[in-house]
A protein has these predicted regions:
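Bacterial N-terminal signal peptides that target proteins for export
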Residues: 2-13
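Mature N-terminal, pre-catalytic/accessory segment of carbohydrate-active enzymes
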Residues: 8, 34-37
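Cellulosome-associated attachment modules in secreted, modular CAZymes
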Residues: 9-10, 20-31, 496-612
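Active-site mouth of glycoside hydrolases
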Residues: 38-286, 290, 298, 308, ...
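Active-site/binding-pocket entry motifs
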Residues: 69-74, 336-339, 566, 603
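Extracellular glycoside hydrolase catalytic/binding regions
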Residues: 82, 194, 204-221, 226-413
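Histidine-centered active-site/metal-ligand motif
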Residues: 179, 334, 563
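Substrate-binding cleft of secreted/luminal carbohydrate-active enzymes
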Residues: 356-358, 362-488
Length: 612
């Protein structure tokens, strides 16, 4: 906890030093001294009305990462740390261009950390801490192995926080996923988010604590609530998706899990996976209909099957509802190839047929998950995809064929993804490395590299605004990309209106003069027709929009403070200066305006300009 508090303090001080503005000077009594976004708070991501994941400035981003497991499987650390240096491996992942690391965990290990429990598992789960102290002296209490061959490992939570710090220094973000309730190598085979050892309330407690602990560190930008909810009705225990409050209703549980996180940190992205089976209600099926009906085996199924966690058909009629936090939802299916299972859409038993993108869309992808991005309802992050592509494991080449179809589709649709996996010890897929985590599979990496976010010149783009991705000099920061020589995507035009007052609304519908209504539950500035005689004349623009990006966010507060700190370098444009004068209009631009905008963005005041 000491490290966490020091990071918070350092971040607050740094923001004032960098901007050259006192964090508390000349503040009115009614204005909070909440700091503008600093290096620990400027990388949070959100979803806009076009179903794009964007940064604080509204710029679209592309999360392209990989998985590295171990914490879920009982090692109390990443797999491979038993043979190689953890810091070095994290550097390698970032240097290879992965800007997001998905880390499978368990409810058990998070509650252990919360309660300062021992690294032995307490008799529950499969827990054996596996760290090579010779390769990882920094993970030992004494800095290595002594002359007598003795050493003491640091506590696993302290080691985890070292990993978080090393990801931060690499400009690489983290998403954890609750892979299972109980720590176990095969824990993911349990279908639900609770089991005999850990209840749903335990799961919610773990999510809440983790979100609160890291709320001031934007290295961890997302939480995947539960890995692969699944199960078939005929198996007795299964995940469903409807509008009920049934204990096995994943949609309802996901709403509770999301709120457990967002009530602690409203800036987290929440990844929500699907289920396995969804009834064909139009044909009379329900949640008691067997997914595999052996009594009618040769007849068309009345249940739509999918990969575990991959079935998002239920979102169409019953989307996850978390009110004003809708802007933090990203749906996250998983998809695999025929080497994991010979699904019917691969036509592996019919030599006269094969699959392609269109057949995959028609037979499986579109109605199962792709409609969400095709129809721009929600962004998608493919949380797991991958497999063997070498001739020994994939002699027909059909697994690589599937991987290429999915990879290219994700590139075309800018679907976010985390490749499965870095580990070499994933039995049915292999990994990006081999030789006991010592060498990279260059053929597989070259295949995946095509789907990593990079510039035309091959520079990998990170998700951190200040720190370039990796240590190898082949990565850039988000600010480098959007403020440098690289041409960003063309921004969409929005309407501008002459006005005198901006008011906060939580309405779900915003109507623009240039477009049809779009759905959003984020707080949205709308224009009031009420005039204010005390306000100065303002030309076309949006009051509070200091950086002229046509919206009001904490980025405007940052722009004001930078303007005050160094007008030559960060000076606002003339219209931006007019828009920025929101606190007692007519007094000119001061730090008070920045804090008023922060309060407005945090819903602590509901109207701009703000007057006393």
């Amino acid at each position: 906890m000491k490290s966490k508090l020091l990071r918070r303090a350092a971040a607050t001080v740094l923001s004032a030093v960098v901007l050259g503005v006192s964090a508390s000077s000349n503040l009115p009594s009614g204005i909070s001294t909440k700091a503008a976004p600093d290096e620990y708070h400027d990388d949070w991501l959100h979803v806009n009305e076009n179903a794009e994941v964007v940064d604080m400035n509204g710029n679209p981003v592309w999360m392209t990462g990989c998985n590295w497991f171990g914490y879920n499987a009982g090692r109390q650390v990443f797999d491979g740390v038993w043979s190689k240096n953890m810091h070095s491996m994290l550097n390698q992942i970032a240097d290879h261009g992965f800007n997001l690391l998905r880390v499978p965990m368990s409810t058990q290990i998070i509650l252990q950390w919360k309660n300062h429990g021992p690294d032995t598992g307490g008799g529950v789960g499969e827990v054996t801490m596996m760290v090579n102290p010779y390769e990882n002296p920094e993970l030992t209490v004494g800095g290595g192995v002594d002359g007598a061959g003795q050493y003491e490992l640091k506590y696993s939570f302290d080691i985890w926080n070292m990993a978080v710090d090393w990801c931060r220094e690499n400009g690489m973000k983290i998403m954890i996923d609750i892979h299972s309730a109980t720590t176990a190598a095969m824990g993911h085979q349990k279908p639900l988010w609770y089991d005999d050892n850990f209840s749903e309330d335990d799961w919610l407690e773990a999510l809440s604590w983790f979100a609160e602990y890291y709320k001031d560190d934007d290295t961890i930008i997302a939480i995947d609530l539960k890995n692969e909810p699944h199960g078939k009705p005929e198996e007795g225990t299964f995940a469903k998706w409807d509008d009920s409050h049934d204990k096995n209703n994943w949609k309802y549980a996901a709403e509770r899990g999301a709120m457990a996180c967002l009530e602690q940190n409203p800036n987290l992205l929440i990844m929500i996976e699907g289920i396995e089976c969804y009834p064909d209600f139009e044909k009379g099926a329900d949640w008691t209909t067997p997914c595999v009906d052996y009594a009618h085996y040769d007849e068309p199924s009345l249940v739509f099957g999918a990969w575990w966690g991959g079935n998002l058909r239920g979102v169409k009629d019953n989307p996850v509802d978390i009110g004003k936090f809708k802007s933090q939802i990203v749906y996250s299916p998983h998809d695999y190839g025929p080497l994991v299972w010979k699904q019917k859409w691969f036509y592996m038993d019919d030599p006269s047929k094969t699959f392609d993108r269109q057949s995959l869309l028609d037979d499986y992808w579109y109605d199962t998950w792709a409609y969400l991005v095709e129809e721009k309802q929600y962004p998608l992050l493919m949380g797991e995809w991958g497999g063997f592509i070498d001739a020994e494991h994939d002699p027909t080449g059909e697994n690589k064929h599937w991987m290429q179809e999915l990879r290219d589709y994700m590139i075309d649709k800018r679907i976010h993804h985390t490749f499965w996996c870095f580990n070499e010890n994933s039995g049915d897929t292999g990994g990006l490395v081999y030789d006991d985590f010592g060498k990279w599979d260059e053929d597989k990496y070259a295949f995946v590299k095509e789907a990593l976010w990079q510039t035309d010149s091959g520079m990998f783009i990170g998700l951190d605004h200040q720190t370039p991705l990796g240590q190898a000099g082949n990565g850039i920061s988000l600010s480098d990309y959007y403020n440098g020589t690289v041409t960003p995507p063309v921004s969409r035009e929005t309407s501008t209106t002459t006005y005198s007052t901006t008011t906060l609304t939580t309405s779900n519908t915003v109507t623009e003069s240039t477009a049809s209504s779009v759905v959003s539950t984020t707080s949205t500035p709308v224009i009031s027709s009420t005039s204010s005689e005390s306000s100065p004349e303002i030309s076309e623009g949006l009051i509070g929009d200091a950086n002229l990006d046509k919206k009001i966010t904490v980025a405007d507060a940052v722009a004001i403070l930078q303007h005050l700190g160094n007008k030559d370098k960060y000076g606002l444009k003339e219209q931006g200066i007019k828009n920025a004068d929101v606190y007692n209009p007519g007094d000119g631009v001061t730090a008070k305006d920045a804090y008023a905008i922060q309060l407005f963005d945090a819903n602590q005041i509901t109207e701009l300009p703000y007057t006393e």
